[in-house]
């Protein structure tokens, strides 16, 4: 609801509102988008994302894990970036329905949480509040590909996973989040694997430069609220679905 209100005010005032979805400015991400747009993957019918860690709950007990302050856990902290990246690369498909489950398991007993390192540990409060999701799973139907994901700040798994699979009927891509990608294809009766090499630009710098251009030209960029709002709607639908234990229609 807050994102929708921001969008409403931006429209009413004629202001440009860009959201901090920095992956839209990443070099690898834009190469992937170009390949999809050019039809190199054929029909991209499914996309899968995995963003899971063994123990990565940030600032446990503090604002990160207090729903009244953060709005949510893994899905809002990590999932937002994966989902937005997917929508961008796939040409902004319209989300139709979502089904998901959000779990509050490994961190809810704060003093029993075992870890070896913690991001933002200086904000942790062992007598604080933990009422957000530390793992989440979901599936989204769109008017393009289906999207499924598994995410976790903390799960009892051996190794962290941070990748996205774009699955097409001609080829597929595995993108290592904030890294490069591998293209899997078929040609002349052969299964091919290629790992493109390229020089990457700093996506934060590209994001800032793009916004400066918006200020000068008054034109909206690829991170405009009207594009980024879809991810907020998906996340809300996943949380609603988890509470209702059923699929939810996305307006």
Residues covered by each model-derived region:
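Short acidic, glycine-rich loop/turn motifs
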Residues: 140-144, 185-190
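Predominantly a Rossmann-like dinucleotide-binding segment in NAD(P)-dependent oxidoreductases
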Residues: 13-16, 23-128, 245
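Short catalytic-loop micro-motif centered on adjacent basic/acidic residues
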Residues: 17-20, 148-150
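C-terminal "lid/loop" region of Rossmann-like NAD(P)-dependent oxidoreductases
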Residues: 191-200
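Residue-level signal for the nucleotide or nucleotide-sugar donor/cofactor binding architecture
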Residues: 27, 77, 161, 206, ...
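A general structural signal for well-ordered alpha-helical segments in protein cores
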Residues: 3, 28-29, 82-83, 205-209, ...
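Contiguous beta-strand/loop segments that form the cofactor/metal-binding neighborhood of enzyme cores
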Residues: 84-180, 206-219
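C-terminal helix-rich "cap/oligomerization" subdomain common to oxidoreductases
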Residues: 2, 7-8, 12, 16, ...
């Amino acid at each position: 609801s807050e994102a929708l209100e921001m969008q409403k005010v931006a429209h009413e005032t004629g202001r440009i509102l860009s959201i901090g979805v920095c992956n839209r400015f990443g070099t690898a991400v834009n190469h992937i988008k170009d390949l999809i747009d050019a039809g190199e993957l054929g029909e991209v019918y499914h996309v899968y994302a995995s963003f899971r860690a063994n123990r990565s709950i940030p600032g446990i007990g503090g604002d990160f894990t207090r729903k009244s302050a953060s709005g949510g856990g893994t899905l809002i902290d990590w999932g937002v970036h994966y989902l937005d990246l997917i929508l961008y690369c796939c040409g902004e498909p319209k989300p139709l329905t979502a089904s998901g489950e959000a779990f509050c398991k490994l961190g809810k007993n704060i003093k029993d949480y075992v870890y070896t390192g913690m991001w933002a540990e200086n904000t942790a409060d062992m007598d604080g509040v933990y009422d957000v999701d530390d793992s989440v799973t979901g599936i989204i139907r769109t008017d393009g590909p289906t999207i499924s994901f598994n995410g976790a700040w903390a799960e009892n798994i051996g190794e962290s996973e941070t990748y996205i699979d774009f699955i097409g009927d001609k080829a597929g891509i595995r993108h290592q989040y904030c890294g490069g990608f591998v293209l899997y294809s078929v040609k002349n009766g052969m299964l091919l694997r290629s790992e493109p090499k390229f020089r990457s630009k700093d996506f934060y710098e590209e994001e800032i430069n793009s916004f400066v251009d918006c200020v000068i030209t008054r034109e909206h960029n690829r991170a405009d609220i009207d594009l980024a709002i879809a991810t907020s709607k998906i996340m809300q639908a996943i949380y609603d679905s988890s509470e209702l234990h059923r699929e939810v229609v996305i307006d």
